[in-house]
A protein has these predicted regions:
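Alpha/beta enzyme core
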Residues: 2-191
Length: 191
């Protein structure tokens, strides 16, 4: 039996670290369901790993729904989180609509990339009763506009923004926050 998405926040409150891996298909999900992970992520990285795109920006909602369904069919004990792909959260109402689609496909939680600029969408998703995971640091959906993959939080200004964004997302009610390519000393402060 799957735990409730609220178990992720409870783990944080208890000082536990979360363990997760990425899955894009049924057989992988079946195998990983036996590993005792906190959740599986159906990542938009499937655009590169499965579909052969150069980055995640070309992944569609249809791609995410298809792969979320496959992963959800493969688990009985592990929560499933699904990425909201690039462009799927342009407005709070669009973010809610697309989050509902991922939930209908079998996701227990959705994951959204971005900080305070995404707070209206984050709050709308959570207000609709959909559990959410934030994603800060290097944001793959912005790799084209940022000119590549770069460590975040090295400068004082970046570090302060990451901390501020994490606090805002946490206070909004996110179940967890993914930190990607965050400067190690700053990341250590989060965990």
């Amino acid at each position: 039996m799957k735990p409730a998405p609220a178990s992720l926040r409870a783990a944080k409150a208890a000082g536990s670290r979360l363990a997760t891996l990425t899955a894009y298909d049924y057989p992988t999900a079946r195998l990983l369901d036996e590993c005792g992970l906190d959740f599986l992520l159906v990542g938009d990285s499937l655009g590169m790993v499965v579909l052969g795109h150069p980055d995640t920006t070309q992944v569609t909602m249809e791609d995410m729904i298809h792969h979320t369904r496959a992963v959800a069919r493969g688990v009985t004990k592990t929560l499933v989180a699904a990425d909201l792909p690039a462009g799927s959260c342009r407005t709070p109402s669009l973010a809610v609509e697309n989050s509902r689609k991922l939930r209908e496909a079998g996701a227990d939680l959705v994951k959204i990339e971005g900080g305070s600029e995404c707070l209206p969408a984050i709050e709308a998703i959570l207000a609709d009763g959909i559990p959410l995971i934030g994603h800060l640091g290097m944001l793959p959906q912005r790799v084209v506009e940022e000119g590549g993959y770069h460590i975040k939080g090295k400068s004082t200004a970046q570090a302060e923004r990451l901390v501020s964004d994490a606090i805002a997302i946490d206070q909004a009610g996110a179940s967890a926050i993914v930190l990607e390519l965050v400067h190690a000393p700053l990341a250590a402060e989060f965990s």
